[in-house]
């Protein structure tokens, strides 16, 4: 028996999985099911490409009083991965550089302020769901110079971890492991 309440709750996921990219963005004509990319619209003749979405991530090293180096991570307050640890980051907005996006996401998710000019490229990875992860590295900061952690609209807290551990997404776990292996 179909649970109507469950169907309504899960409707956005069903719609997203079945209807996303199902119609031409130029004229609205439906594509044939399982059309390959790039898609040529039979209605208007326009070609549509499915390009990756750029995501900026940032590694902020932190040195504690004992001389141990760690990284700032956030505990996610939104899905996917609610309650799990992640690196600060998010989608790059139109009109901003990846460095600007990295420090904006750091500020939005932790309240920590950084200068975009200080961000250096650490690595680039292809993520799941069609993303391209551009990971920046900031200069290390002293733990004593950082303000206390406060929840934000997207995170429950920020904290410093001193070694690799599982994060909300495999690509983030790999980036963290790569950082600690190179530090």
Residue ranges and their predicted role:
Residues 92-182:
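Unchanged
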Residues 60-61, 73, 138, 160:
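Conserved hydrophobic "DFG−1" position in protein kinase catalytic cores
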Residues 3-4:
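Compositionally biased, low-complexity intrinsically disordered regions
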Residues 62, 66-108:
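Conserved Nudix-box catalytic region and its N-terminal flanking loop in Nudix hydrolases
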Residues 13-57:
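Acidic, metal-coordinating catalytic segment for phosphate/diphosphate chemistry
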Residues 57, 71-75, 135:
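Beta-strand scaffold of nucleotide-dependent catalytic cores
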Residues 46-51, 64, 78, 123-135:
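Acidic pyrophosphate-coordinating catalytic loop
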């Amino acid at each position: 028996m179909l649970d109507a309440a469950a169907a309504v709750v899960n409707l956005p996921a069903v719609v997203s999985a079945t209807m996303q990219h199902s119609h031409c963005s130029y004229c609205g004509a439906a594509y044939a099911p399982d059309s390959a990319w790039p898609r040529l619209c039979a209605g208007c003749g326009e070609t549509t490409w499915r390009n990756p979405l750029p995501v900026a991530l940032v590694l902020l090293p932190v040195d504690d009083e004992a001389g141990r180096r760690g990284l700032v991570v956030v505990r996610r307050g939104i899905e996917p991965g609610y309650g799990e640890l992640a690196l600060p980051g998010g989608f790059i907005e139109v009109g901003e550089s990846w460095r600007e996006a990295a420090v904006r996401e750091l500020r939005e998710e932790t309240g920590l302020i950084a200068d975009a000019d200080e961000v250096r490229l650490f690595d680039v990875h292809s993520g799941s769901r069609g993303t391209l992860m551009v990971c920046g590295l900031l200069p290390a900061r002293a733990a004593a110079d950082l303000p206390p952690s406060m929840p934000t609209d997207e995170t429950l807290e920020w904290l410093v971890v001193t070694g690799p551990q599982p994060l909300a997404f495999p690509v983030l776990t790999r980036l963290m492991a790569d950082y600690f292996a190179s530090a």
